[in-house]
């Protein structure tokens, strides 16, 4: 790998694809295991070894990683010895900073207190619990394998193990989900005591079970206006409870924002490792095949070629658009300094487009000393930062971003 002088990644996402079954909304690259306990014998161990070989091929020459994230799939299905092997490889070849955030996704019904203790012994210090909903009927409709009793057992294990830094995931806009269901899930989530809560709006991904049902008219998802009300209610309940709404879907207690995901939102480089994972290195985004056999073939070819960084560099315009799209997910918004090589013409186009929405109160602009600017004060010289209003601007963010992208792309 030719490391050159580009900025090396300080984060690594590691994909653990194993799942007991595929949820009806899921289009992630997974490997369905059924309900048997996994061991490192056979294909599970083969996958772990493949990921370790990919890690060894990175030839990292930068600073130790600041964040490591085990996502999936269901990482809590992988035996702890498998996680240990991967973490040892990460530390050996990429380095892990002493104060690194090391996260793992865990699902109810796939771990106990002993397992949590094992994770802590490995240095894992942040846990993301995939609850999604507290109502058994909604969980069943989504094809989730767990139920409310599994959630309660998971929360008990977390409490007994004195896990302090953990997050709880919820989904809004589920089939047959009512306002009462959503309020109950928020209330129960707060009572569980996480330091971080993620609220994701359901997206009907192509070729998923939900997508096929929707095309046949068999899926009763809430209409967009009700989903918007769910979003407003979640924002109100969680912020009133003391959570900081720092990203479109994410809320954290002070000091508990997810450090790893902020790498993505700031459009900074990162390693993606394992089946279906995507990397952003040296200005290049590239993914791996989404099946195990495809990934293994790709890995052998990549190793035989000397571990190059594949793909073409993102163009300056693409980089600018990605930085805007990702950065504006953060409620703090974007500063000019965070936009790569933005010129005066582009600044003027960005401001002209954004201020055209100003009378709808969907955006805010800030100058020096973080002072909010009135609409007639917004110039390329006075504006230092801009963001969506919360929650209304966020709800219309797709419309605003579409107009922004059209304005910036018209000369290309």
UniProtKB/Swiss-Prot annotation:
Q: Where are the transmembrane segments?
A: none
Main localization (coarse):
cytoplasm
Boundaries of every Radical SAM core domain copy:
4-241
**Could you give one GO CC term from the UniProt record?**
cytoplasm
Q: Which GO terms describe its molecular function?
A: 2 iron, 2 sulfur cluster binding; 4 iron, 4 sulfur cluster binding; coproporphyrinogen oxidase activity; metal ion binding
Judging by the UniProt lineage, the source's domain of life is: Bacteria
Which amino acids does the record list as binding S-adenosyl-L-methionine 1?
13, 72, 105
Q: Which SMART domains match?
A: Elp3
Per UniProt, the keywords (alphabetical) are: 2Fe-2S, Chaperone, Cytoplasm, Heme, Iron, Iron-sulfur, Metal-binding, S-adenosyl-L-methionine
Effect of gene disruption?
Cells lacking this gene have no detectable phenotype.
The induction field says: Induced under microoxic conditions.
Q: Which cofactor does it need?
A: [4Fe-4S] cluster
Q: Per its UniProt record, what InterPro entries does this chain match?
A: Coproporphyrinogen-III_oxidase, Elp3/MiaA/NifB-like_rSAM, HemW-like, rSAM, rSAM_horseshoe
Locate the residues binding [2Fe-2S] cluster. Answer: 19, 23, 26
The residues the record assigns to binding S-adenosyl-L-methionine 2 are: 73-74, 132, 144, 169
- What is the annotated localization of this protein? Cytoplasm
According to its UniProt entry, the protein's GO biological process terms are: porphyrin-containing compound biosynthetic process
Its UniProt miscellaneous note says: Might carry two S-adenosyl-L-methionine binding sites with only one binding to the iron-sulfur cluster.
Q: What's this chain's function?
A: Probably acts as a heme chaperone, transferring heme to an unknown acceptor. Binds one molecule of heme per monomer, possibly covalently. Binds 1 [2Fe-2S] cluster. Although this protein has sequence motifs typically found in proteins binding the [4Fe-4S]-AdoMet radical-SAM cluster and S-adenosylmethionine, spectroscopic evidence suggests that a [2Fe-2S] cluster is present; S-adenosylmethionine was not detected. Has no detectable coproporphyrinogen-III oxidase activity.
The Swiss-Prot or TrEMBL record describes its family as follows: Belongs to the anaerobic coproporphyrinogen-III oxidase family. HemW subfamily.
Q: What is this protein called?
A: Heme chaperone HemW
User: In the UniProt record, what gene is named as encoding this protein?
Assistant: hemW
């Amino acid at each position: 790998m030719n490391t050159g002088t580009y900025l090396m990644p300080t984060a690594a996402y590691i994909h653990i694809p194993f799942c007991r079954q595929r949820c009806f909304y899921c289009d992630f690259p997974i490997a369905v295991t059924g309900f048997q306990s996994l061991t490192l014998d056979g294909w599970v161990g083969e996958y772990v070894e493949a990921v370790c070989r990919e890690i060894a091929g990175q030839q990292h020459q930068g600073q130790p990683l600041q964040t490591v994230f085990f996502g999936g799939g269901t990482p809590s299905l992988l035996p702890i010895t498998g996680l240990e092997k991967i973490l040892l490889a990460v530390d050996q070849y990429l380095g892990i900073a002493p104060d690194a955030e090391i996260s793992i996704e865990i699902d109810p019904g796939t771990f106990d207190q002993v397992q949590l203790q094992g994770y802590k012994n490995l240095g894992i210090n942040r846990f993301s619990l995939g609850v999604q909903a507290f109502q058994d009927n909604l969980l069943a409709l989504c094809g989730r394998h767990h139920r409310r009793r599994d959630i309660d057992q998971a929360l008990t294990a977390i409490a007994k193990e004195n896990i302090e830094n953990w997050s709880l995931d919820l989904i809004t806009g589920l089939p047959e989900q009512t306002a009462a269901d959503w309020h109950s899930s928020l209330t129960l989530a707060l009572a569980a005591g996480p330091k971080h809560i993620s609220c994701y709006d359901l997206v009907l991904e192509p070729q998923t079970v939900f997508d096929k049902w929707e095309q046949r008219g068999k899926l009763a998802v809430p209409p967009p206006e009700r989903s918007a009300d769910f979003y407003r209610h979640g924002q109100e309940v969680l912020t009133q409870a003391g959570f900081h709404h720092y990203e479109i879907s994410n809320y954290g207690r002070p000091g508990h924002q997810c450090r790893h995901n902020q790498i993505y939102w700031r459009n900074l480089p990162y390693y993606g490792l394992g089946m279906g994972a995507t990397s952003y290195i040296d200005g290049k985004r590239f993914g791996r095949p989404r099946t195990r056999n495809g990934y293994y073939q790709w890995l052998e070819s990549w190793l035989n070629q000397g571990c190059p960084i594949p793909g073409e560099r993102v163009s300056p315009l693409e980089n600018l658009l990605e930085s805007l799209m990702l950065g504006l997910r953060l409620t703090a918004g974007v500063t000019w300094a965070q936009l790569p090589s933005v010129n005066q013409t582009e600044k003027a186009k960005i401001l002209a487009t954004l201020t055209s929405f100003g009378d709808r109160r969907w955006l805010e602009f800030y100058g020096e000393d973080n002072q909010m600017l009135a609409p007639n004060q917004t110039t390329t010289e006075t504006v230092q930062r801009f963001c969506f209003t919360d929650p209304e601007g966020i709800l219309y963010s797709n419309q605003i971003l579409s107009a922004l992208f059209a304005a910036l792309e018209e000369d290309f």
